[in-house]
């Protein structure tokens, strides 16, 4: 339908029609028998409203920039003040007050000697950058063959080509194969489905041992990094003793550990 189609009697219908013609939604199903785009107009706290007035609990808020809730006036003021002062400037070989202050705050909140911050545009970009940095690190150390990355089945690390290669969800990967070579998969940390300890009261660390076995099976010379999700939304739980064990494993086998 055109923009002036008289059959489009509501703003919701007008926007939905425009979306059908021009908006290619992420993870959308491009079929004629699927209902049209639902138009989300506004948000407040943990809820969002569509153009027809229906309210929904926003269970996608953790994806990007609304973890603190919608409609926060102090956040809107801060964003407006920053845009009025300096809308954007790259931190290639420069710094600006907001980036400097935020990096210092993150270093203060981070444990141990994690005191340097490399900003990226989002999760996929962060994983891509971490894999590249791991490869560069070993190349500078005279070990250019260390290029592989170990990650878990069911783990979600992003949708760009490198991050998708490390991701362990086959349903979102197969249509893009072949992916970036060098991604090695190991079992997830799912105590309920673990073949060695699902009937035991305590975890046997089988999933941690599987990472060591995978690294040793690869060489371990070719392995640059192990990628882990301390908080998983797509796979299964990660237990604290797994993290402790894997940190020590990375030190023993000289592989980097990326959280």
Predicted features along the sequence, with ranges:
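Catalytic PLP-binding core of fold-type I/II PLP enzymes
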Residues: 220, 238-259
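Active-site-adjacent loop/helix segments that line or gate small-molecule/cofactor pockets in enzymes
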Residues: 2-44, 94, 99, 207
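A short, flexible beta-alpha/helix-coil linker loop
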Residues: 62, 85-86, 190-193, 230-234
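Glycine-rich loop-to-alpha-helix module at the N-terminal edge of alpha/beta enzyme cores
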Residues: 2-5, 12, 55-143, 150
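PLP-dependent aspartate aminotransferase-fold enzymes
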Residues: 104-224
């Amino acid at each position: 339908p055109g923009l002036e189609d008289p059959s489009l009697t509501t703003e919701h219908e007008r926007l939905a029609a425009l979306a059908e013609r021009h908006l290619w939604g992420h993870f959308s199903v491009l079929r004629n028998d699927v209902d049209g785009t639902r138009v989300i107009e506004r948000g407040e706290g943990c809820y969002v409203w569509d153009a027809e007035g229906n309210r929904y609990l926003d269970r996608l808020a953790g994806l990007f920039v609304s973890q603190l809730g919608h409609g926060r006036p102090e956040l809107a003021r801060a964003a407006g003040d920053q845009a009025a002062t300096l809308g954007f400037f790259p931190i290639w070989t420069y710094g600006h007050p907001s980036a400097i202050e935020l990096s210092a705050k993150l270093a203060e909140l981070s444990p141990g000697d994690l005191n340097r911050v490399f900003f990226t545009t989002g999760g996929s970009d962060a994983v891509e950058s971490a894999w590249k940095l791991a490869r560069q690190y070993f190349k500078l150390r005279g070990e250019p063959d260390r290029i592989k990355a170990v990650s878990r089945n069911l783990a979600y690390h992003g949708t760009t080509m490198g991050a998708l290669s490390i991701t362990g969800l086959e349903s979102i990967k197969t249509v893009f194969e072949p992916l970036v070579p060098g991604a090695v998969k190991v079992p997830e940390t799912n105590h309920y489905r673990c073949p060695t300890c699902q009937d035991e009261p305590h975890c046997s660390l089988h999933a941690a041992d599987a990472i060591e076995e995978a690294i040793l099976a690869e060489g371990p010379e070719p392995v640059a990094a192990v990628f882990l999700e301390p908080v998983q939304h797509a796979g299964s739980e990660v237990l604290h003793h797994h993290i402790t064990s894997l940190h020590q494993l990375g030190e023993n086998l000289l592989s980097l550990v990326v959280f």
